[in-house]
């Protein structure tokens, strides 16, 4: 009994001692009194717990290419970690700061973020893509050119319109006194005088006049420069040209003799001789000087016969040609006028072109392109020359020898044309015969009745035999004549 009492006393003493020891350990003021061995044991326990529960690293990427590291088992040891962190914070606050322990820590760069994120590259923007006026120089040039073209179109069109109206106002009284109808546009069934020009396009104006003796009508065409076209304006700076007035008078057949005659600048006559069908056939000689008739050196003459030249170059005509030689491009009278030569891809045409008795005048407007409305008054005497030429062509008559020579020239031209087109006409006739035979054979083959088909074949055979017999008879007659 005494022994049992002694054992209980010992247990109580031991329990009180151990409880006092743990109470002292929880007090924050007495942490420093314990040895480092106690903390070493605690660190060993923590290392063992870390090695026993390895953690897996999970890396997730969001839209901004940032990486996040998640540790598995974090929730399980969250409470223990907070307690350890509090304990370590208390330790670091009480322990002195050691400079050697953290030496080089601040100088070590943080490479974890650079490994996880892509490097940022800055690209230099080209100069032509930057927002500056220099980036739009091509667009500026295009807009400027377009505006210049539009402005030139408006100005050029208006100037041509003013020139045409100025010409008409100057010549209207003279035209109305010589023609019953002035300005028919051809839109009405009955000829009506509109009293105004007909605009074909921005640089060509037409005027039709009729109702005068000895002529069917007169077509006046004002051919201005293409002032509405900027490219044409730039081209004229290198090579100036003039506005032109072309007048075409269609004569009645009974009021004009058979002859071809032309007078004008030497350059214009050479060009017309190459282009016009009648001048190339009836006036094959080179242009001759008009000094014999008192014409200036700038003008030359093309004539079918010398009699025509003597008859046309009277005093008044020479006066017009001499005083207005700078404005006259060409004067062309012809009973065989058919226009420019017909150029066909396959040889000559099979028939002669239709001809008209025509008087053709071409005048240059003064100014060499720098024309003003007041310059149109200088062309009024040339219109008087046109009216005089109409009356002169009606009065002029060839003598007997001249008519015979003119008829021979026209027969010669027709014969030469038939010789040139003989082979082509034979080929055309052969092709027509073959086409006719082919159509007849197709008609026989398409016949459903055998008896009718046989009769058609026999009729075709008889026709071929008759043609062959006629051909043989002609050959025999030719041989007899040759003998």
Curated annotation (Swiss-Prot):
Pfam families with a match to the protein in the record: CCDC47
Cytoplasmic topology ranges: 21-135
UniProt keywords, alphabetically: Coiled coil, Endoplasmic reticulum, Glycoprotein, Membrane, Signal, Transmembrane, Transmembrane helix
Basic and acidic residues compositional bias, start-end: 105-118, 430-472
UniProt record, GO biological process: endoplasmic reticulum calcium ion homeostasis; ERAD pathway; multi-pass transmembrane protein insertion into ER membrane
Signal peptide per UniProt: 1-20
Residue intervals annotated with topology Lumenal: 156-483
UniProt-recorded Gene Ontology molecular function terms: calcium ion binding
Glycan-bearing residues: 178
Stretches assigned to coiled coil: 451-481
Compositionally biased spans, kind Basic residues: 473-483
Bias (Acidic residues): 60-104
PANTHER family tied to this protein: ADIPOCYTE-SPECIFIC PROTEIN 4-RELATED, PAT COMPLEX SUBUNIT CCDC47
Oligomeric form and interacting partners: Component of the PAT complex, composed of WDR83OS/Asterix and CCDC47. The PAT complex is part of the multi-pass translocon (MPT) complex, composed of three subcomplexes, the GEL complex (composed of RAB5IF/OPTI and TMCO1), the BOS complex (composed of NCLN/Nicalin, NOMO1 and TMEM147) and the PAT complex (composed of WDR83OS/Asterix and CCDC47). The MPT complex associates with the SEC61 complex. Interacts with VCP, HSPA5, DERL1, DERL2 and SELENOS.
Name of the protein this chain belongs to: PAT complex subunit CCDC47
The organism of origin for this protein: Pongo abelii
Taxonomic path: Eukaryota, Metazoa, Chordata, Craniata, Vertebrata
